[in-house]
Structure formats: C-alpha cells, structure tokens
Amino acid sequence: MSFRTIEWRDNKVIMIDQTRLPAEEVYNEYTDFQSVAQAIRGMVVRGAPAIGIAAAMGVALGAREIIADSFDTFYRQLENVCDVIGRTRPTAVNLFWGLERMKRVALQHKELDLNSIRELLKAEAISIETEDLAICKEIGRHGAALVKEGASILTHCNAGGLATAGYGTALGVIRGAHEAGKGIRVFADETRPWLQGARLTAWELMKDSIPVTLISDNMAGWLMRTGQIDFCVVGADRIAANGDTANKIGTYSVAVLAKENRIPFYVAAPISTLDLKLANGDLIPIEERASEEVTQIKGIQIAPEGVKVRNPAFDVTPARYITGIITEKGVVRGDYERELKALVGQ
C-alpha cells in the first residue's frame, strides 16, 4: 500500500489526516497524548482497529510525559492518561482493548525502573500496530474464499487500510479477492454524514486499482433489487456476545435490504472487536456526534439554521441479519454466542 495510516517514528506518532482526504494526503505529527486524544475525537484517525492503535501509541506518549519517583505515582498518572483517551469515542471497543493492554504491560513490569517501563510501553504500542496488519491479512484470506468469481461487492463506510494498520477488514476481504484474481468490482456507499465511503473507500480502492463505483446511500436497495449486488461486507466497531454488531450508521439498513434480497451479508473484524461481556447489541453505547456534521458539509450550511438534528455515529445490526463474522481465526456462522466464545478460547 502506498500510504501509512499510523506509525511510531522518532518518539512521535505519525498519522495520515483522514479529514483532509481525498483532496490532500497530509501526515500529522503528535508528541503528546492530549493531541492524540483530540485526533481520535476529531476523526483525524477513525475505524475501530486504527483507534485502538492510536490509543496505545497515545498512552506510550503519555508515559514519556509523566514525572514520577515511584511506580504507584507513575501508574496513577498513566490511568489518568488512559481516562482522557478513553473518553474520546465510546462505541469502538478496540479503543478500550488497547488501553487495557497498555495498562497490563505496566502492571506486569512494575518492578522495573520507570524508563524501562516507558520503553516497554512504546514497544507494546508498536507491536499492536504490527499485529493488526497481520490480522487484517488473515481476515482477508478467510473472507476472499467466500467471494465468487466476478462478484459485485457492496461495502459501507470505510473498513480498509485507513481504518486499521493497513490492508483493512472489510476491504481486506476485497483486497484478498482482488489479489486472488477473482475479477471483482466494488460498490461503495458514500456514507453520510462524514462521507467515509466517498472520501476514503473510493480513494483507497482507486489507489490499488480495484474497480470501484461510488453510490449514494439510498441507491443500495435498488441495486440489490435489480441483481447488481452479489455480496455485502462491512467492518465493525463492537460485536456483542450474541453476534449483534455495532458499525457505522446505515449498516443496519444495508443488512436488512441484503436479507430481503437473499444476498449474503458478512461482518469482517478482528477478535479484539468482540465484547463478550455484553450479552447483546442493546447494551452497546452509541456515540452521538455534533449536529453540524449533518447540517453542514465542509463548513457549508445545507439545512435550515436551528433545525433539530439526530446524529448517532453507529447503529446495531441484529445477528439474525448477519450471514457470518469473518475473523483472523476463521468464519463464524450460526450460533454466534457459542461460536464466538469458542473462538476467543482458542
């Protein structure tokens, strides 16, 4: 791939600014955890796995900022760093997974001097990024096997290299099928209000010379009804124990339409996106974002001033609409509660 979503370089976090794509390919440098938290909140970096990586790297930066003379003092301040980052995006479980993983590293090495702990935290954050790339390629391999030759694939939002360390989850499946020579083509929903499909998915696929057609969100049902879609695949921000899946707002509509038109609908996500502590999707917290994201596009007002707005960033697709969940360990179908628990236990 010709871009890097996020990396640690010279004790700085480097992230591609996704708010400026596709017009500009700009990389921002971050040297403190507060600025990383703001980048997560402001959608400079987005997509559950990428948010998890950014959170971990933010903790590593925060650890370098802490002044302490004992582990207990250091760890209390590290928890404060994690609390600040943890308040940025409530739905993506990878955020909290990354924070907990970093805290665990500190606790497991509390007998070491603080500089050694800081170095271990940096190494852990880099490992999370490296692991994610390998995980996405495994997801792509498992998912590509499900795609028929010449398939037309619909995807929603952006679950690609920009949403991960690279390669992607849903777009990992698409990349895997493309690399296998299956002659696929992709339809990308524009994905209001942030237009991740138009700005990010189309940009990624065009850079990789994967045939892509951009559609407005309200076209998806008609394309399915007229036989122009063979396969649907999306990413996930959190998957409950029963398979209910939170993903970008509009995913639920796509899933219902797919079932009505007998089109397979798959979710592609790493095991770190599973939240088996939540029995079902009704318990997943849904982030509500600013009204201006709906009433404006790039600062231009497109709705009457003062109109009431709802802007949930995610919806929840019940498991009954999901054909299968593609993970790095394989594809889960049917009894999600039992199968997901078994998968995590492997």
From Swiss-Prot:
Keyword Isomerase set for record: yes
Gene3D superfamilies: translation initiation factor eif-2b, domain 1, Translation initiation factor eif-2b, domain 2
SUPFAM superfamilies tied to this protein: NagB/RpiA/CoA transferase-like (SSF100950)
Pathway annotation from the record: Amino-acid biosynthesis; L-methionine biosynthesis via salvage pathway; L-methionine from S-methyl-5-thio-alpha-D-ribose 1-phosphate: step 1/6
Site keyed Transition state stabilizer: positions: 157
A Pfam family reported for this protein in Swiss-Prot or TrEMBL: IF-2B
Chain ranges passing through the membrane: none
One MF term in the entry's GO annotations: S-methyl-5-thioribose-1-phosphate isomerase activity
GO BP term, pick one: L-methionine salvage from methylthioadenosine
Catalytic activity annotation: 5-(methylsulfanyl)-alpha-D-ribose 1-phosphate = 5-(methylsulfanyl)-D-ribulose 1-phosphate
Domain of life the protein comes from: Bacteria
Keywords in alphabetical order: Amino-acid biosynthesis, Isomerase, Methionine biosynthesis
Binding-site positions, substrate: 46-48, 89, 196, 247-248
Active site per database record: 237
Assigned EC number: 5.3.1.23
InterPro entries in the cross-refs: IF-2B-related (IPR000649), IF-M1Pi (IPR005251), IF_2B-like_C (IPR042529), Initiation_fac_2B_a/b/d (IPR011559), M1Pi_N (IPR027363), NagB/RpiA_transferase-like (IPR037171)
Similarity comment: Belongs to the eIF-2B alpha/beta/delta subunits family. MtnA subfamily.
Function statement: Catalyzes the interconversion of methylthioribose-1-phosphate (MTR-1-P) into methylthioribulose-1-phosphate (MTRu-1-P).
Name of this chain's protein: Methylthioribose-1-phosphate isomerase
Biological classification of the source: Bacteria, Pseudomonadati, Thermodesulfobacteriota, Desulfuromonadia, Geobacterales
